């Protein structure tokens, strides 16, 4: 079993983001990834990771109003595991690799192949932005983050688009606002890195948020889900070899 700590915050308490790679116990095993709901811990990260290695997990492929999901049941040993969520659901589209199939409605016993623990700031200092492009009210534009990485192993640049939010802007103002957004982002974000959670996330630490970012307080860590965009690559490989270069912002008319 492989295990990794992605350390973005060294204080106590911290928010734990746990993702686990699994393989089905079956003659034709499926490989899948599940991620636990965020939880807060004061246990040192190496100790928490050791206790996570005792995880036993079952999944069940089923349906929900949001689409196909995996219902996850988990158990683990250790005092720190009392804070670990034990029952939850994850998107099957992100959890399953493109070659794997699970039988609908059947309880699946899984072996743990790798565990990723990312330490984030405490509750109240972490803001999670979902990649959800559904309309909200009378919005005119979508704010998109273009996350530029380089594969340091191959020297290949990669750009991942991530939906941030819907905004209302007049067409006559869009060019000016887009220029301002770019400037605001340059000043607002002091650090950005990727980590394995919900497939993959971009963690941005905000320094001096203003303008379109002003609702995010200074010192906040902002999480943007990237998982749906990178299913073709091994998450472990991405975390080891992709280096974040910059994040640009653009407005797209609806």
Curated annotation (Swiss-Prot):
Keywords: Host cell membrane, Host cytoplasm, Host membrane, Host nucleus, Membrane, Viral matrix protein, Virion. GO terms for molecular function: structural constituent of virion. One of its GO terms (biological process) is virion assembly. It is a peripheral membrane protein. One of its GO terms (cellular component) is host cell cytoplasm. It is found in: Virion; Host cytoplasm; Host nucleus; Host cell membrane. It comes from the Viruses. Signal peptide: none annotated. The keyword DNA repair does not apply. Plays a crucial role in virus assembly into filaments and budding. Early in infection, localizes in the nucleus where it may inhibit host cell transcription. Later in infection, traffics to the cytoplasm to associate with inclusion bodies, the site of viral transcription and replication. During virus assembly and budding, acts as a bridge between the nucleocapsid and the lipid bilayer. Forms dimers. Forms higher-order oligomers. Interacts with glycoprotein G (via N-terminus). Interacts with protein M2-1; this interaction directs the matrix protein localization to cytoplasmic inclusions comprising viral proteins L, N, P, and M2-1 and mediates the matrix protein association with the nucleocapsid. Belongs to the pneumovirinae M protein family. This is Matrix protein. The gene is M.
């Amino acid at each position: 079993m492989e295990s990794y700590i992605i350390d973005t915050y060294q204080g106590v308490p911290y928010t734990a983001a746990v993702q686990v790679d699994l393989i089905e116990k079956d003659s034709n095993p499926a490989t899948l990834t599940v991620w636990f709901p965020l939880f807060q811990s004061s246990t040192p990260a190496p100790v928490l990771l050791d206790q996570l290695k005792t995880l036993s997990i079952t999944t069940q492929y089923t349906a929900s109003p949001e689409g196909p999901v995996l219902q996850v049941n988990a158990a683990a040993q250790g005092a720190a595991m009392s804070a670990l969520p034990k029952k939850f659901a994850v998107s099957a589209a992100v959890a399953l690799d493109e070659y794997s199939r699970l039988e609908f409605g059947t309880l699946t016993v899984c072996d743990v192949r790798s565990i990723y623990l990312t330490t984030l700031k405490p509750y109240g200092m972490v803001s999670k932005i979902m990649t959800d492009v559904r309309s909200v009210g009378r919005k005119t534009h979508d704010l998109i983050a273009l996350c530029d990485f380089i594969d340091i192993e191959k020297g290949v640049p990669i750009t991942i688009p991530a939906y941030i939010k819907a905004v209302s802007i007049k067409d006559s103002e869009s060019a000016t606002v887009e220029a301002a957004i770019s400037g605001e982002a340059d000043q607002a974000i002091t650090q950005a890195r990727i980590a394995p959670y919900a497939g993959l996330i971009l963690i941005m630490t905000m320094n001096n948020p203003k303008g379109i970012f002003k609702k995010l307080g200074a010192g906040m860590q902002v999480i943007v889900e990237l998982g749906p965009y990178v299913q073709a690559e091994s998450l472990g490989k991405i975390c080891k070899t992709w280096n974040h270069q910059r994040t640009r912002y653009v407005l797209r008319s609806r």
